[in-house]
Structures are given as C-alpha cells and as structure tokens.
Regions:
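Conserved glycine-rich cofactor-binding loop
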Residues: 13, 20-21
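Active-site helix of classical SDR
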Residues: 128, 164
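Conserved glycine-rich Rossmann-like NAD(P)H-binding loop of the short-chain dehydrogenase/reductase
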Residues: 34-51
Length: 243
C-alpha cells in the first residue's frame, strides 16, 4: 500500500514529539507538506524552533516548542498551549524515545533502566493524557506511536529497550480499544533499524540497507490517509535487505 500524499491535511493540527531530527523531523516535514499545521516538540528547544522556522520558510505552518516528555509539568504546559492556541489536535505522533546503553540486563544500572522507561513509555502516557481530551472534544483524532521491531523480537544486550517497546505496543493496543467509541484511531509503527544517530544498533551495519527516516514518514502518511471507516492498528516496517 502506497502513501496517498494527494490527500490534503489542511485544517489539521499535528503534534510530533522528538521532532527536531531524524524520524521525527522527517514525519513533521511530510505532514507539513500535506498542509497540516505541525507542532514539533523536543528537549532541544533551539533545535525544534530552527526546524520549524525552516519549514515556515518553505511556506508551511509550523511551531517548535521545547518540551520534555518525561516531565509531567512540561507536558501539561504543552497541552494547555495547544488548547489555547489551536483548540484541537488531530494527529499525535509519539516519536520521542531513547535507546539506552548496550548492556546485559544484570549489568545495566538502575538509572539507565529508569531513563528508558520514563521516555519510551511514561512519556507516551503523559502525551496521550494531555492530548486525548482535545480529541474527544473534537470527536476525532489519530494517535501514532513509534515503537520498534525490538518490541516484537528480543534484542540481545538491549532487554530494557525491548521491554519498553513491548510495553508501548501493549499500551497502543489497549488505548485503541478504549478510544474506538470516541472515533479516535490509535496505530503503532514498529520499524527495524533506521539510519539515524539514534539507532541503538547502528554500529557494524551496512547503513545503505537500513531503513531511512522517510520510510517511517511514508508509513505515517499511509496511516493518516486511510478512509475514515477503517484504520491500520499496526505496521511492521522492515528493510528489504537485512543490514
């Protein structure tokens, strides 16, 4: 199935966490090109603001906001800004995440374990908690969680990361059932290794064969352009050739 970029998202408001680089930037850029108003968030406020300015320079509507998804007060402030400034959120892409160190589980320090779960799981909960009331009020919305194939298959020396993504998948399926009656769709994308600085298993792989950020952005476009009577709950995204 090919992404249908001929569909206009004019009037739609999209929020992309971790939107300052890599996968998040690719997703934000693609949604803006489809005429959505895009709010990019990230801990590096200067970076997301610069990316937003670059998008505005190309004639798109964008705003960059500093937000740490692991900080409840920061996320609640973002939610209040969205409510006052835009009055709605049609698309939420929970992309912010961390990989953590490559380590056997019994060697992983508790602080690293906590950091992985704060970002990859609790941060998604905070964002959903903040944005869903706006979607319910509007009677529509689409939440897209960026997970990983590591949430389907064990990742040696990355058990904590795998566990966080298994948790994110479970959260996605559960919230999808909770919100179906509210006309809110919830999808999860599980990509394999993507050629970004983030990739926890990038070293030693043939990056030419890895997925690119635009591949994940294509999957997001495919999801948000589905006809309203259906939705795709899960996308498993693999490279054609094994890196």
């Amino acid at each position: 199935m090919q992404p249908n970029e001929s569909v206009s998202l004019s009037g739609a408001v999209a929020v992309v966490t971790g939107g300052g680089r890599g996968i998040g930037q690719a997703i934000a850029t693609r949604l803006a090109a489809m005429d959505a108003t895009v709010i990019l968030t990230g801990r590096d406020e200067a970076r997301v603001q610069q990316v937003a300015r670059d998008m505005e320079g190309r004639g798109h509507r964008a705003e960059g906001i500093g937000c740490d998804v692991t900080d409840l007060a920061s996320v609640e402030a973002l939610g209040e800004h969205l409510r006052k400034t835009y009055g709605r959120v049609d698309i939420l892409v929970n992309n912010a995440g961390i990989g953590g160190p490559s380590a056997l589980l019994h060697e992983l320090v508790p602080d690293d374990w906590d950091a992985i779960f704060r970002t990859n799981l609790r941060g998604v909960y905070y964002m959903i908690r903040s944005v869903v009331p706006l979607m319910i009020a509007a009677g529509t919305g689409h939440i897209i969680n960026i997970s990983s194939l590591a949430g389907k298959n064990p990742l040696p020396r990355g058990a904590a990361y795998s566990a966080s993504k298994w948790g994110l998948n479970g959260l996605s399926y559960g919230v999808a059932e909770e919100l179906r009656g509210q006309n809110i769709r919830v999808s999860v994308i599980c990509p394999g290794s993507v050629d970004t600085d983030f990739s926890p298993r990038r070293g030693g792989k043939d990056t030419r064969k890895m997925l690119k950020p635009d591949d994940v952005a294509n999957a997001v476009v495919m999801l948000v352009t589905q006809e309203p009577q259906s939705f795709i709950s899960e996308v498993l995204l693999r490279p054609t050739q094994k890196p």
